[in-house]
Amino acid sequence: MDEFDGFTRPTSSNSSANRNSNNSMNRVENNNSNSDSANTVDSRGDAHTRMRQGFEKSFPSSPNKKRPRTNEGDRFIPSRDASTELWTGFTKVEGPLTPVKKKQSVADRNFTTLLRSELFGSNDETFNNSPIATPNTTIGVSTPRTDSGIDDIELTQRTPPSSSHTSSSILQNTPVTPSRKIFHYLSPRDRNKSSYGKKAQYQDNPNRTIYSLSPVRSITKDLISASRLEGRELPSIPYRVLDAPGLAGDFYLNLLDWGQCNMLAVALASRVYLWSGISSEVTVMHNFYPTDTVTSLRWVQRGTHLAVGTHNGSVEIWDAATCKKTRTMSGHTERVGALSWNDHVLSSGGRDNHILHRDVRAPEHYFRVLTAHRQEVCGLEWNSNENLLASGGNDNALMVWDKFEEKPLYSFHNHIAAVKAITWSPHQRGILASGGGTADRTIKLWNTQRGSMLHNIDTGSQVCNLLWSKQTNEFISTHGFMENEVALWNYPSVSRVGTLKGHTDRVLYLAMSPNGENIVTGAADETLRFWKLFDSKSKHSASTMSSPFDPTMKIR
């Protein structure tokens, strides 16, 4: 019997016949004869003494054949059979990531993306397609560029083609010096002659890195924003639902808006209701019955004044703090379905195909009439930072106007249905998004600085509203036939982040809270649903805001 730390186990009795066959190996095997198997261990101390004496000698190995399976008694010593790979039996089981570990993983991935982009450029394929991994590929190394915009040195590494007279396996693994020059230099005369125009053009380019105020490059910001919210979860249900009986199911109207004063205005039939985002109290501002009905609403950018468009073609200004009308402005001959503010200028679009610019401070309020649209104007949105106005109409046209000019700067006719949904990006200059109706079902993104279309997204349903997030580089779209859903999109990847469901009819109205944290959607199912989508970055205080109706405000 073999003795090991007080435990006994049976061993093979024919080990003495193979002692002279494997003298070169130095493995420890206790192969005693049958005469020694009768000996027993009386105490644990003798077992340790015999084990030390056995290790001081060199024992030959057992014959080279499969060892019989043994049932070892020591539960602390695993069976180390040669045919068993321990890593397959003792692999650590990875459980689901906790929220803390998930955030840490996302942060690590974003930081790695930032370092790659800043140190090695935006082409991630250079990390994988090295010359060693792919010897038959051509690798272009970006050349250092001076302030003059001229490539002083051109460095290109190429692998020469293999010859047909030699073994391809040998040549692919043998470094060969290129037959042409690696470095190219230009004489000062040729350099000045060929690059004078390029130098001036490059130095005047506003997109140069030295003119940027950001600590990172623009491509890095796009990469980080694209991966920041990748795969994040959206709420499955709204955190508040309000009944809205009498909410019109008309695609061409705009009956919902959330002001900077944290008041939500909604028009139900002929009445305008105000819901306080602070106290959740509901107030009836005014009832226009029986003389008129409400067709559009829009809060002033700063303050508590609300513009109301009516079916008769008039536009009224109301002070929501006192629920009193301050003035009435005429001009349209039919209903006013779209309103948009640019400081003290209120622009209105009507069913008479006209757009009116009104200065609310002047007695003679409207000073410009735009007549480029051929059918009803159903979408208006000012970009106050660049003084650009975007308008959409039932003539399937999207137009961009430079300030108060009478002719459009651009006129796009790519949509094949009415263009009501319009929104400007608050994060990039000149980026505009527009959505088409039932026959179109697309969201198109435009670069208004160049007058070109950037993206075309087929949503599969009617696009009723578009709204860009104030906090993140994302935009929200609401849809009618046939999905009746709310979608969140990432920019610039234009990938769908998620979908909000719950409405049972067309989601015709959309507004965002003043802090940019929540949105509210209104549908023809006569409900208002509140969704929390973003994290608030700052607190907005209505008491510190100046209004264009403030008498102490200067007239520009």
UniProtKB/Swiss-Prot annotation:
Region feature Disordered, mapped onto this chain: 1-80, 126-173
Task: Spell out the Polar residues composition-biased ranges.
Answer: 126-146
Q: Which organism is it from?
A: Schizosaccharomyces pombe (strain 972 / ATCC 24843) (Fission yeast)
Residue ranges of WD repeats: 246-285, 289-328, 331-368, 372-411, 414-456, 458-499, 502-541
Among InterPro entries, the record links this protein to: Cdc20/Fizzy, WD40/YVTN_repeat-like_dom_sf, WD40_CDC20-Fz, WD40_repeat_CS, WD40_repeat_dom_sf, WD40_rpt
- A GO BP entry: mitotic G1 cell size control checkpoint signaling
What name does this protein carry?
Answer: WD repeat-containing protein srw1
Composition bias of kind Low complexity appears in 12-37, 159-169
Q: Could you tell me which residues carry Phosphothreonine?
A: T98, T177
In this chain, composition skew of type Basic and acidic residues spans 43-55, 69-78
Per UniProt, what does mutating T98A do?
Increased mobility on Western blot
Key words, A-Z: Cell cycle, Nucleus, Phosphoprotein, Repeat, WD repeat
Family, according to the entry, reads as follows:
Belongs to the WD repeat CDC20/Fizzy family.
On this chain, the residues bearing Phosphoserine are S62, S187, S214
UniProt keyword annotation of Cell cycle present: yes
Instruction: Provide the function of this protein.
Output: Has a role in cell differentiation and cell cycling by negatively regulating cig2 and cdc12-associated cdc2. Down-regulates the level of cdc13, particularly in a nitrogen deprived environment. Regulator of cell cycle G1 phase progression. Prevents onset of mitosis during the pre-Start G1 period. Required for degradation of cdc13 mitotic cyclin B during G1 arrest but not during mitotic exit.
Where it sits in the cell: the answer is: Nucleus
Which Pfam family, any one of them, does this sequence belong to? WD40_CDC20-Fz
In the UniProt record, which is one GO cellular component term? nucleus
Q: How is it modified after translation?
A: Phosphorylated by cdc2-cdc13-CDK complex. This targets srw1 for proteolysis which in turn promotes cdc13 turnover. Dephosphorylated during G1 arrest.
- List the residue ranges forming a coiled coil, or say none: none
Q: Could you state a single Gene Ontology molecular function term? A: anaphase-promoting complex binding
Major localisation: nucleus
